From Swiss-Prot:
Source organism: Coccidioides posadasii (strain C735)
Targeting presequence: 1-32
Subcellular location: Mitochondrion
GO BP annotations listed: inner mitochondrial membrane organization
Keywords: Mitochondrion, Transit peptide
Gene from which this protein is expressed: aim24
Family: Belongs to the AIM24 family.
Protein name: Altered inheritance of mitochondria protein 24, mitochondrial
Annotated region (Disordered), positions in chain: 341-377
Upper taxonomic lineage: Eukaryota, Fungi, Dikarya, Ascomycota, Pezizomycotina
């Protein structure tokens, strides 16, 4: 399957069907840089390294060799078409962490293999509804293991980290296996204006990482200054840079009315009856039910209007089959994105910059006093006073 490319153009060229092909009509318009979207993994070397993922093609048959990513102590190779098996080659004393129940087979000296069940931060991961049961496999001699998942519509992507760029795994069940003594995987939770970091895993260090996605996994490479908007349920992972993903909603056609502000809310809250009603348990329970129904409607009915905007330089991995919006965003994140003004993404950044400008020390003020000259007064014997101006001042 050839790589898909989204072409960003300034204009639109109509096409006509002629001789079995679509041919453009009219003059050629100027083009901008193409934001390439390539499937991963593939036959050619398309390691997701610190900066880019080269264009690649997919295998043409089941027997075609898969992608092989080699590090110092291990190698990951994706097999099958579609990519349904992960072959892991481990050297001696190298640890492999894989999700429980994903080990298919193993070759090598089985008497030297040690497999233990590890609980990776069970309290935090359970609170975030993330898998925390992983199998640690190590051997005193080199071995080769096969890893797969139960889902029939899942494909693999291999990420190689060199220690210069960190990755964020957004989907809760996307993290499959990893290896590397210097590789660290930690669940993250941003208690402030978090976007897709609820239930995410931050990966730092150096090593190999295997992620799974529903359907086919594609890579989107953004250069500095480029932007890309993606649905949060389709985002599998992305590189961490100074520009965090921001909420985005497309503008919708709506009829707006200008209603004068009469201050009825302030007048009504002056009533003791309404204030006591707002403090009652019945009113609080009713408002909780209302907010729950509103969040459910935003997730179920208007969930396709919630997007995230990425800004380059960055690499984003997306999956062709989207997961549920509830698996990517929490109730608080859905309400935050839905409450943002459509088409506005830099409001929070401008607010922070304005606060920093206010906190900066004010420049020194000029008191307005300036020496314009100097005179010397002398008193004569007859009582007269003479003023003499001093030159050079």
């Amino acid at each position: 399957m050839e790589p898909m490319n989204y072409l960003v153009r300034r204009g639109f060229r109509p096409s006509a069907w002629k001789y079995g092909k679509w041919r453009p009509i009219g003059k050629t318009v100027s083009e901008r840089r193409r934001i390439s979207i390539q499937p991963v993994p593939s036959v050619e070397s398309n390691t997701v390294n610190a900066s880019y993922l080269p264009a690649a093609s997919t295998p043409s048959s089941v027997t075609s060799p898969g992608l092989c990513i080699v590090s110092n102590d291990a190698s990951f190779e994706v097999l099958g078409s579609p990519y349904s098996l992960l072959s892991v080659s481990l050297s001696a004393s190298q640890n492999l962490y894989t999700r429980r129940g994903t080990l298919v087979g193993l070759t090598g000296k089985s008497e030297n293999v040690v497999s233990t069940l590890r609980l990776l931060e069970p309290l935090r991961r359970a609170a975030l509804r993330m898998p925390f049961l992983y199998q640690k496999i190590s051997s005193a001699s080199p071995v080769n293991a096969l890893i797969s998942v139960r889902s029939p519509i899942t494909s693999f992507a291999v990420v190689q980290l060199d220690g210069t760029v960190d990755w964020m795994i957004t989907q809760r069940d996307a993290l499959l296996s990893w290896t590397g003594h210097a590789l660290t995987v930690k669940p993250t939770l941003n208690r402030e204006l978090s976007l897709v970091h609820w239930g995410s895993s931050k990966v730092t260090g150096r090593g190999l990482l295997a992620v799974v996605g529903k359907g086919q996994v594609y890579s989107i490479n953004l250069r500095a200054g480029e932007r890309y908007i993606a649905h949060p349920s389709n985002v599998v992972a992305y590189t961490i840079n100074s520009h965090w993903p921001r909420p985005f909603r497309f503008k919708s056609t709506s009829l707006k009315f200008q209603i004068p502000k009469l201050g009825l809310g302030t007048l009504l809250m002056k009533s003791n009856f309404l204030r006591n009603l707002a403090d009652s348990d019945t009113w609080k329970a009713t408002m909780r039910i209302f907010h729950t129904v509103r969040t459910w409607a935003r997730r179920t009915i208007w969930g396709d209007r919630l997007f995230l905007q990425f800004e380059g330089p960055a690499t984003v991995l997306i999956q062709s089959r989207a997961s549920r919006i509830a698996e990517s965003l929490t109730a608080r994140e859905v309400n935050e994105i839905a409450s943002t003004q459509p088409g506005v993404t830099r409001e929070a950044t401008e607010t922070v910059e304005a606060r920093l400008e206010k906190q900066s020390p004010p420049p020194a003020k000029d008191d307005g006093m300036k020496t314009v000259g100097q005179s010397v007064a002398s008193v004569r014997r007859d009582g007269k006073v003479e003023f003499e101006k001093v030159d050079g001042v």
